[in-house]
Each structure stands twice: as C-alpha cells, then as structure tokens.
Amino acid sequence: MRPLVFDNRFVRELPADPETGPHTRQVAGASYSRVNPTPVAAPHLVAHSAEVAALLGWDESDIASPEFAEVFGGNRLLDGMEPYAACYGGHQFGNWAGQLGDGRAITLGEVLNGQGGRWELQLKGAGPTPYSRRADGRAVLRSSIREFLCSEAMHHLGVPTTRALSLVGTGEKVVRDMFYDGNPQAEPGAIVCRVAPSFIRFGNFELLAARGDLDLLNRLIDFTIARDFPGIEGSARDKRARWFETVCARTATMVAHWMRVGFVHGVMNTDNMSILGLTIDYGPYGWVDNFDPGWTPNTTDAGGRRYRFGHQPRIANWNLLQLANALFPAFGSTEALQAGLNTYAEVYDRESRAMTAAKLGLAALADADLPMVDALHGWMKRAEVDMTLFFRALAEVDLLKPDPALFLDAFYDDAKRLETAEEFSGWLRLYADRCRQEGLDADQRRARMNAANPRYVMRNYLAQQAIDAAEQGDYGPVRSLLDVMRRPYDEQPERAAYAQRRPDWARERAGCSMLSCSS
C-alpha cells in the first residue's frame, strides 16, 4: 500500500489522558485517551468504497494488498498513526448521561490528501477503550454491514454524512442480545473504517461544560474553529458567533435532507450529533416505507417515539439548544447563541420548502401551497403509501389527464387505497392545476423531480437480505447493494428488484421493520 500522510492535530493540540490502555475509567481534563486496536484472529475484506479510497489517494491495487485487511482489521498500524478514543458525554433520550466517549471506536489518525482535504480514519468495533464501560468494544457483522452501506448510500443521495472506507470481517464471534430479551447469540464480528473530516460531536463540548472545565472548553472551541472551520474569520468573539451559526445551519440542512429522502436516524442523542452537520452513528436507523411521520425503527424508542420521523427537525433544534447551553460559559452571553438557534429555524424552513418544492416539481413552495402539501401527507399516511415509490411515480403524471392508476405499485393495502381513492383523485387534479402554472414541459418537470426523489434507498429489508447472505459467507449481495446505491437517482432497469416496496414477509421481521441498539 502507498503510504499515507498523517497530520494528527487532535492529539497534538489537545490534552491527553495521562493513563493509557483500555481499562474503564472516568477521564477528566483530557480530550482523548491513547489506546490501540485489539488484534483479531482472521481479518478479511468484506467490502470497500472505491470512492473513499480515492479520497485518500488509493486505488484498487492498494485495497488488494494483504496489508489492507490487517490495518483496517486493527492488527497493525501504519507509520504516522496515533490511535486514540475520544472523551465526550451526551443527552440520551432527553436525559443527561454523563461521560460516554468512544466505547468501541478508535481513531487511527488524520490523513492529508493531495487535494488539501483532511480525513480522519476511525475503526468501529476495534476493541475495548476506557469508555467501553461493561462492553467488549466489538461490533457484529450485522450492524457493521448496515453502517457501511448506509454511510455510502447517504453520500450518493446527496445527504451530508460520514463515509465508510472498508468493512472487514474479524474471523471471531461476538455475543449480542439483539433485542435485550435474555437470548444472547454468538454472531460474526466485523470492523468498519469510518471516514470524516472530523468526528467531534456536540457531546465533546457538553461534557466539559458539565464538569466546569472552562479552560478545556475554550481550547476545544478554538481548536474546532481553527481546524474544521478554517474559512471563518474575524475577531475571536465574531468567530465563535459565526461558528455556532454555521453549526446550526449545517444541522438544519442535514435534517432537511433526511426528511426529503425518508431517513429516520433512530437515536438522535447529542453524542450522535456531528459538529460538522454530518449524519453520524448509523445504528437502529430506518427508511420510511409506508409514509408515517410517527414511525421509528428503534425498539428502544417504541414507547415514547421521541426520535420518530416527523419529530426529527424538532429534536435537532433541542440538541442544538443543549449545545448552546454547554457553550454559554465560554461565550459569556446568549445573544450569539440565540442568533444561531434562530438561524436553524430559518435555514430548516428554507431548505425544507425548497426540497419539498423540488419533490413536487415546483420552482418554489409558496404559503398558498402549504395546504396542498399537508393534504398530501395526510392522505399518504391514511392510504399507507410507499414514500419513495409515490414521489418517483408522481414525476410521470400527465398533467392534462392525471391517472391514479400510475401509483398502484406504491400501495401497501388495497382496501385503504380504495377507501381513499376519491380523496387522492381530488388532490391529483389540484396538483396538476398547480404544476401547469410552472410552465415546464414534461421532460423538464420529470428531471427536476427525479433529481430530488431517489429511485433506490437503503430499505431495511434490502440490507437484511445482504446480511443474511453475508452471515453465510456470501458477500456478493453486500457489494451488489453498494453498487446499486451509487446511482440512486438513475433508473438502472436491470436492478429494478431493488426498487420494490417492502414485501409482506418483511413487515414484522426483526431487522426489517424494527431494530435495537444492539450491535
């Protein structure tokens, strides 16, 4: 493998835990703990992203090197790597949880590529760290496949996200109780190499504020601005104000994209919120099949549904408020923080309107259009309509003669389709009238809509089918699914099977409809 150029500013410029090794402990006055990955028995490459490899300056010959699986399976380090686990806290399901930290993620270092980019490499499932608590620091193949595939699928959908370089099987078993019901099972282990410019989270700042460590809080703020937001200029006070405003704006844009494509994160705790506004920590996520703002894929959240699909914009705002509370001791006033929170609301409204307009083939969404949108969403929920298939079919409607039959494949329940048929026909006529005001020809309208409405999304049942095969040693379906998701807006006629609505067998199956945090 060609050597990588490392410039590990996080470990160079921020204080380290004076203790080393993976034994569990409370870590104060430090941003990270030095810890090495724990070697595994038989690392082997399951899948990789050629696009992410290219970001690092590598090609297929580097990936094919026997050294690759050894490095990204945690068995050896490259020159320049300085492994560590980060220290942070967070609010989990609305409650302060204290110190959390990287319990099974180990950052290897920060790579500089030839285009001026900085990419942090992080192994997830690489063994115990000081933050593992009572866990083993490992990850199962099941959850690792889901994280690897969704990281790349989201990127190709145009959603801000962390990336994934590789998925490496460990040759070892990991014991997990998938639904916390007292039935633990031994499952194949795996390690994902996650890649992002930064893995700093809201929780990094929250823990320092909760502990009253104002000195390190100020250092972390200044470090984050200097390394991760180099375009922000001005006085120290102005930089901080613009930085928080930027964090709020990026978070708003990220969540608006989630809502556009039907993604439900599942566990929007503040320790799972990226300071860069990237989707991070793909655990019990899900994709909306039949449109339902109240749906959550996370069994842990099944009662309160705090992180349900339609609640995500509000939760992101709440999480930013917790970040603002943590930053207040360093900012000294609420003015800049409130301005940032106001920016979140403004940017989310603007981006959400623009994306909804694009999904409907409109140039812009006026206030007068909102009742039409609300009526559509209400009907979609009542009629149990597949979100992805519906919007893709909507691009094919003949505005002069709209035909409801075009949408037959999008319905999950024929009785509900018939019950709501008149309501939908009325909406479709209203929509056609509105579209005719745009003055676009059919091809222009279709192109606008198909650029906003994916044909292919990482449906849970598709991921589960790939997992089932991989657990039997067949990695072909994982690689095929990754390849389909590289072009989610293209028709890909030879891959139409990946664009089908959720089959009946997957409606209640574990891993296809509901998931847990067990991974």
Curated annotation (Swiss-Prot):
This is Protein nucleotidyltransferase YdiU. Its EC number is 2.7.7.-, 2.7.7.108. ATP binds at G101, G103, R104, K124, D136, G137, R194, R201, D281. It is an enzyme of class 2 (transferase). GO terms for molecular function: AMPylase activity; ATP binding; magnesium ion binding. Nucleotidyltransferase involved in the post-translational modification of proteins. It can catalyze the addition of adenosine monophosphate (AMP) or uridine monophosphate (UMP) to a protein, resulting in modifications known as AMPylation and UMPylation. Its cofactor is Mg(2+); Mn(2+). Belongs to the SELO family. Pfam families: SelO. Mg(2+) binds at N272, D281. Keywords: ATP-binding, Magnesium, Manganese, Metal-binding, Nucleotide-binding, Nucleotidyltransferase, Transferase. The active site is at D271.
